[in-house]
Every structure is written in C-alpha cells, then in structure tokens.
UniProtKB/Swiss-Prot annotation:
Keywords: Bile pigment, Chloroplast, Chromophore, Electron transport, Membrane, Photosynthesis, Plastid, Thylakoid, Transport. Pfam families: Phycoerythr_ab. The light-harvesting system in Cryptophytes contains phycobiliprotein complexes. Unusually they are composed of either phycoerythrin (CPE) or phycocyanin (CPC) but never allophycocyanin (APC), with only one type of biliprotein being present in any one species. Unlike cyanobacteria or red algae these proteins are not arranged into higher-order phycobilisome complexes, and they are found in the thylakoid lumen. Light-harvesting photosynthetic tetrapyrrole chromophore-protein from the phycobiliprotein complex. Contains one phycocyanobilin chromophore and one mesobiliverdin chromophore with binding mediated by both the alpha and beta subunits. Belongs to the phycoerythrin family. It comes from Chroomonas sp. (strain CCMP270). One of its GO terms (cellular component) is chloroplast thylakoid membrane. Heterotetramer of 2 different alpha chains and 2 identical beta chains which form 2 alpha-beta heterodimers within the heterotetramer. (2R,3E)-phycocyanobilin binds at residue 71. This is Phycocyanin PC645 alpha-3 subunit. It is a peripheral membrane protein. Mesobiliverdin binds at residues 73, 81, 97. GO terms for biological process: photosynthesis.
C-alpha cells in the first residue's frame, strides 16, 4: 500500500516538475486534469484496513513477559548464569523471559464481561 502511494506521488511530482510554465489563470482543461489526478490518487491515500481477524477454533496466543529479579537474594548461591561477569552484580541477577502462551477464557466469563459492558453502555 505504501509502495503504491509512493509511486503515485512520484508520478504526480514528476509531472508537476516537468510541466511548462503556466499563466496565472487556470483554464478549464487544467482544472479537469488536476481533478482527475486527485481522483486517481485519493483512493491510494486512505488507510489500509486492519487484518486482525479471529476465526473460531483457532488458538489465541499472546506474549507473556516474566521478570526474574534475584538482586539481593541470599537464600542460595546463584549458579544458573554461566556467562561472563558484567562488572556489576545487579546486572547479572536479573532476567527477562518472553514467551508466547495460549490465552484461554471460559465462555461464561466472556459472556458476563460482554453483558456488563453492554449494561454500562446502555446506562450512559
């Protein structure tokens, strides 16, 4: 979509740059040509539709972020990390884990949330 828009704008820009100098008054032919160019370019400039489609039966997954922070922990010797020392103990005692997990919601809970939202909208 962006490529089409860029090509269309490049064509219009090159046509404007290479046109002969025109008089101060625009005649009917120039107005019609400008309107035609605008009609061609306008559909390309509208935003593209989102392709976020959910089909029933597919699994819903989302990134789940887990932060492990063992700074100041003295319960055990931290021997999990095998890499080089960073120079600061605080940096070596933290970890961030990102994992895609299936998100499941019970149908009855979803129904209750929907009804609650609809009731809230009706009351306004």
């Amino acid at each position: 979509m962006i490529a089409k828009t860029a090509v269309a704008l490049a064509l219009v820009a090159s046509a404007v740059a290479l046109r002969p100098t025109m008089s101060l008054s625009a005649n009917r032919r120039e107005v019609v040509a400008g309107a035609g160019a605008a009609a061609v370019v306008a559909p390309m400039l509208r935003p593209a539709e989102a392709n976020a489609v959910y089909t029933r039966g597919t699994s819903l997954s989302a990134p789940v972020i887990t932060i492990f922070d063992a700074r100041g922990c003295t319960d055990h010797a931290n021997k999990e990390y095998k890499g080089d020392w960073s120079g600061r103990a605080e940096d070596d005692e933290c970890c961030v884990k990102i994992q895609m997990q299936k998100i499941s919601v019970a149908e009855d809970v979803a129904r209750l949330v929907r009804l609650e939202c609809l009731n809230e909208l009706k009351s306004k």
